Regions:
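HotDog/MaoC-like acyl-thioester-processing domains
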Residues: 1-3, 62-64, 75-117
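Intrinsically disordered, low-complexity segments enriched in small/polar residues
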Residues: 21-24, 55, 80, 84
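Hydrophobic beta-strand-centered segment that forms part of the acyl-chain substrate-binding groove
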Residues: 34-69, 73-78, 96-98
Length: 117
């Protein structure tokens, strides 16, 4: 899946680069878009929680009116968890960052891992 996200002035650090914290927001938007497209949003039977997230910054993103493109795909599916991998692309299509998020499916009451639906 590909999602375009507009950079905000508030995303910038004093050097004019997109701050590393903003990448987490971008990844969350892309993750929720992917989960929604897969019709796997949270319901009363299960919830998805982030277990880990790793971002490798390749090159700085600077402010631009053109959106950042986030490419996402699901990988590494297990019984109670899965990973989403991302590529963050600048306005030229160059890779600015690569990331992975590991999510677990849990019972919303107990918080314990459960088998994926």
């Amino acid at each position: 899946m590909r999602l375009e996200i507009q950079r905000r002035f508030s995303d910038l650090d004093p050097l004019g680069h997109v701050n590393n914290v903003a990448y987490h927001d971008y990844l969350q938007e892309a993750r929720m878009g992917l989960i929604s497209d897969l019709d796997a949003v949270v319901n009363d039977d299960y919830a998805m929680v982030v277990v880990s997230q790793e971002i490798r910054h390749v090159k700085p993103l600077e402010y631009s009116r053109k959106p950042v493109v986030i490419e996402t795909r699901v990988t590494d599916m297990a019984r109670t968890s899965y990973s989403i991998v991302y590529r963050v692309l600048d306005e030229k299509g160059d890779i600015a960052a690569e990331a992975t998020t590991r999510l677990a499916v849990v019972d919303p009451v107990s918080g314990r891992p459960i088998r994926m639906p």
